[in-house]
């Protein structure tokens, strides 16, 4: 099981941090979670051919997390000398399929019916079981509909990704005893914004979930201010390992 942070930023363009995108590989199956602008290119940089993708997961519909969805569907449809036969399944929160239908009104009906099998699945509180991995989802507090994901490998490793969320018991429960918890940490404590986390709130979630490793991402500029708070405040609340995400950060579970 491998985790690669494809984009550690937010909706603000940055030369340092790409838009949100995360890749989990389980038994050679690449599973992307969110695909903000530039994610497809960063997948290629990470060694993943977009034609390998059979499952793509979204936490919510905000553009900094979804803007490469249409380019993916189009690329699989128009790549020369490539005729896809495998189904692509795209997962998102309640209403995600309706969101795509609205996009199709502007981009064209091909978005819903390309020349290969395509399915959109809305999730709420679900458990999806596959041969070598399981995905659990739970609603979190952000936009009208937002979900977090927990990926568990057959070998017992686990990663939880919050997407965008405020402090809520749902993310604590979903992340219980997880190996790696990826949480957004958008703003410093003194500039809390509804629907987002700060260093202290993120650390409290990590402590209550009893995760082993907390990775903080989705920082808004100026990054240095939030990073300073993470380094000074989070260790006082959460005793486990704490990392600040950066693009192409990679973790590997060996066994």
What are these regions (language model features)?
Residues 1-46, 147-163, 180:
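Conserved beta-strand hairpin/beta-sheet module of binuclear metal-dependent hydrolase folds
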Residues 3, 22, 34, 43, ...:
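Divalent metal-coordination and catalytic microenvironments
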Residues 32-36, 54-60, 93, 159-163, ...:
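Active-site neighborhood of phospho(di)ester-bond hydrolases with catalytic His/Asp-centered motifs
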Residues 36, 141, 166:
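Adenine-nucleotide cofactor-binding loop residues
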Residues 38-89, 179:
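Active-site metal-binding motif and surrounding structural segment of the metallo-beta-lactamase
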Residues 72, 76-89, 143-147, 152-153, ...:
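P-loop/Walker A phosphate-binding loop and immediately adjacent motor/lid segment at beta-alpha junctions
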Residues 87-145, 247, 254:
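Metallo-beta-lactamase
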Residues 167-250:
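Cap/insert and terminal regions of metallo-dependent hydrolase folds
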């Amino acid at each position: 099981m491998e985790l690669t942070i494809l984009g550690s930023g937010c909706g603000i363009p940055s030369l340092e941090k790409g838009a949100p995108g995360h890749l989990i590989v389980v038994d050679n199956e690449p599973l992307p979670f969110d695909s903000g602008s530039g994610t497809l290119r960063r997948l290629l940089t990470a060694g993943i051919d977009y034609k390998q993708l059979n499952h793509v997961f979204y936490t919510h519909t905000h553009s900094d997390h979804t803007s490469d969805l249409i380019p993916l569907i189009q690329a699989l449809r128009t790549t020369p000398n490539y005729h896809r036969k495998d189904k692509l399944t795209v997962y998102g929160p309640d209403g995600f399929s309706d969101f795509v239908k609205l996009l199709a009104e502007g981009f064209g009906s091909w978005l819903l019916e390309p020349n290969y099998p395509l399915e959109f699945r809305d999730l709420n509180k679900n458990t999806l079981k596959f041969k070598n991995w399981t995905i659990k989802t739970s609603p979190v507090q952000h936009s009208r509909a937002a979900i977090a994901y927990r990926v568990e490998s057959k070998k017992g490793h686990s990663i939880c990704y919050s997407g965008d969320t405020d402090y809520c018991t749902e993310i604590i429960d979903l992340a219980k005893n997880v190996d790696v918890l990826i949480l957004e940490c958008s703003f410093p404590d003194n500039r809390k914004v509804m629907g987002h986390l700060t260093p202290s709130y993120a650390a409290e979630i990590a402590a209550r979930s009893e995760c082993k490793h907390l990775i903080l991402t989705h920082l808004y500029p100026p990054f240095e201010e939030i990073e300073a708070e993470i380094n000074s405040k989070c260790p006082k609340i959460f005793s486990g390992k704490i990392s600040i995400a950066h693009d192409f950060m990679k973790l590997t579970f060996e066994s």
